[in-house]
Amino acid sequence: MFSASHFCSGSLMMSHPLSSLRDLEYHGAFVERHIGPNDVEIAQMLRVVGYDSLESLTDAIVPEKIRSTVALDLPKGITEEEALAKIRVIANKNRVFRSFIGQGYYGTHTPKVILRNILENPAWYTAYTPYQAEISQGRMEALINFQTMCADLTGMEIANASLLDEATAAAEAMSLAKRSAKSRSDLFFVHDAVHPQTLELLRTRAEPLGIVLRVGTPEEALQVDVFGILLQYPDTFGRIGDHRVLADAVHARGGLVAVASDLLALTLITPPGEWGADIVVGNSQRFGVPFGFGGPHAGFMACRDIYKRSIPGRLIGVSVDAAGHPAYRLALQTREQHIRREKATSNICTAQVLLAVMASMYAVYHGPQGLLRIAWRTHRMAAILAAALRGAGLTVGEYFFDTLHIVGIDALAIHCAAAAAGMNLRMIDNAQIGISLDETVTRSDVVALGQVFGVQVDVEALDAITADALPAGLLRSSAFLTHPVFNTHHSEHELLRYLRMLADKDLAMDRTMIPLGSCTMKLNATAEMIPVTWQEFACIHPLAPVVQWSGYRQLIDELEAMLVECTGYDAISLQPNSGAQGEYAGLLAIRAYHRSRGEERRNVCLIPESAHGTNPASAQLCGMQVVIIKCDRSGNVDVDDLRMKAEKYSDTLAALMVTYPSTHGVFEEAITEICEIVHAHGGQVYTDGANMNALVGVAKPGRWGSDVSHLNLHKTFCIPHGGGGPGVGPCAVKAHLAPFLPKTLPLPGDAAGLPVQGTQEAKVGMVSAANFGSASILPVSWMYITMMGAAGLRKATQVALLNANYIAKRLAPHYKTLYTGRHGLVAHECILDVRSLEKVSGVSAEDIAKRLIDFGFHAPTLSFPVAGTLMVEPTESESQQELDRFVDAMIQIRGEIAAIEKGHLDPEDNPLKQAPHTAVQVMASQWGHAYSRELAAFPLGVLHHAKYWPPVARVDNVYGDKHVMCACIPVEAYKEKGDSEIQDLIEEDASRC
């Protein structure tokens, strides 16, 4: 028989058993899994910082005026197994029907090799946005595959690396058209057959920007002067229209043509780029990404090359590295909010990278022939069903790809019959039904759908006699996806190895700490991720009847209550599917609140100069005038400047946007006074929730005077960053702003599952395509809060504060921390000021960031919020060992800088200026540097045991923006420049033998 001694040895052996079963039933185990340092390490770190407990450290950092005096009103934490069992009960309340609703969402098969090796793989889902090119080559290659896929299928010249959803992409297309069109009109024409959710978002976006929408038929568009038009192709009812004449007419008047389309349909029908479209948007969801009750899915935008400097969102481009080899990087970043602020093309920050990677690999796996087979099979199923229904005397649309539009029927009776058979159809009105088929449809599904209409379908017989239903004049003739990457990896082994090769090129949290300030790269626990792929969450259509998603309703209600308790607000919307959209929703709420009080004049938004770029970009989208507030020498909001400008704009003040703790990494003592000043002049206070990881369980913004915040569930509440998305940015408000949260689409669903009319009278439109945004990843945050419990959440915040101060303290002899609060402490992040070092040594913050790659680290945030600095946020999930590894690397780098200062290393030919160093460089036959290979690649002995090799040397940013290329690299570009020389040496060696 085994005893405890079989599992314990030496100092770890327990001298006596625990006293009771209650002690052994340790329900708080997950807290210790999530928080990196154990209690012994916490005590050691506290001694370094100079405090004897987490409580005393918290009291020293967090101002007393805002500090919570009572614990969060949340249950105690539970184990992973208990939480999974609890959420399984919730999931089982959802009813998974076969959904043929369509409206932009379609059934799909996620290839299992993609499910396991991307969606369930932390090498992909724990990565950050690829700002640091050298350690992001793998996911950027996947994203350039996505861009190539979208550009090829739409017939356009360039595409971005994903947007939040199709409706948001359409709104962005409208803004792009407004910026770029020659026409000075304020009118944007919208096809009356776009998806309803798209029209809702267009209405939300247009009004604050002074854009006038007109909805009508394509024929009516010929009669008006517009700066742009949006067409749906195929349209929401499945019809495939010929819009060539209309496109020519719009162009003749100086307008642009935007098209919302379907990537799978475009394998068969003429792509919009070939008949006059300037911009094409859509959703890549049906390329292997489940419904997810609305998301997350990767929207996309493709456009003509002349608009590349105005296209919103991330854009992956091709440059060269220091050795002249091809390398990927984020291209044309000066378009983006983190640089251009209120002048940016968009407020988009987080996009949908993980889902874009999945969609791109779906195309890689199937290739052009596989996609054609899927598209033709889907179309044949639809054509056979249409033939059967017509044969029974029903009226069905003539031309379509996958969606049948059936008119002149008792739609309610059909809808109910389908529901009784476990199927969802789209009830357009009392006399119209829509049926959208997809790659998951089988012959038995077609038979069952026919039976709903009382029609017997002989699939085999109808297949033999039924013609296709695509218009002959709009059949695609052009090739697509011709690059070798889409024609190589079609066996599972090949794709598996390709995915592994790409993942190995990158640094994600499965390999190292990612100490990015303002990004909160914390543990995304496996238990939190598991429910995401359950079919009860993944396979619910976002427009399914209410009675089918009571499990989701419970989960959403419970999560909203949890977040309200954590923040001190009164109401919350989970609809925003990014932090930027949460900001947008919050500012729209403020705007609508003022207008409801007859104060339309209030349009000034005060923003500190240290704010994240999304703040002014979001304010601009809401039609607000941005006025900048100075910061004082300590990095805090200059209260005198705030007071002066609040008085100056008292009659027009709408809001103050403030981040707390500040983007400078400190708890500002004057935050309550700041709120009082703004309120005294009629404004509302918007607190950016980006730094909520320093507040949960410690302070509540809704209690110190803030009126509204967005949260980042992909930061504070553990949804993974996915390499640049997905994210969820809930908007939380005080009670007086609750009526102005985003509206939702009416859904079918009374007690019997019959359609009922929505009754919500919202004053603010939708900000995302789906009512609950990226609903399928909400279980991640629910699991995190449930397992941590009230005490665990508070401890997580306290350890986040400790870890940041531990790093600042240990590095104090070597690097100056730019800003501190009282007692010389920082919040959950610290800014390391290296500007004085650069003046003496020539070594910049960027050089340090690149050198950290040689140590196996992702760099801290570079030059934000202060140019020439590094902002470090370690999060509570990092152990003391990992923190010390980072500190040791930074100390070694400081030693190298000192060697440059003393003349021991060359000012240019040194390991910092030449970093990072690739394996190819280090192992080359010639080493032309004045420092050793050992110093280049193994500056610390620990690296001999675990070494990350960057796949490329330092990437040339200037070259990349001068030579913009945003599609797959031609294979010949990879040919090594030195191949012939190496071959000559090999032949010379052979001749000697």
From Swiss-Prot:
Is Oxidoreductase included in the keywords of this UniProt record?
yes
- One BP annotation, GO: glycine decarboxylation via glycine cleavage system
Catalysis performed (reactions): N(6)-[(R)-lipoyl]-L-lysyl-[glycine-cleavage complex H protein] + glycine + H(+) = N(6)-[(R)-S(8)-aminomethyldihydrolipoyl]-L-lysyl-[glycine-cleavage complex H protein] + CO2
- EC number in record: 1.4.4.2
Q: Name one GO molecular function term.
A: pyridoxal phosphate binding
The record describes the protein's role as: The glycine cleavage system catalyzes the degradation of glycine. The P protein binds the alpha-amino group of glycine through its pyridoxal phosphate cofactor; CO(2) is released and the remaining methylamine moiety is then transferred to the lipoamide cofactor of the H protein.
What family does the Swiss-Prot or TrEMBL record give for this protein? Answer: Belongs to the GcvP family.
The record's section on HAMAP family has: GcvP (MF_00711)
Q: How does it assemble?
A: The glycine cleavage system is composed of four proteins: P, T, L and H.
Name the record gives this protein: Glycine dehydrogenase (decarboxylating)
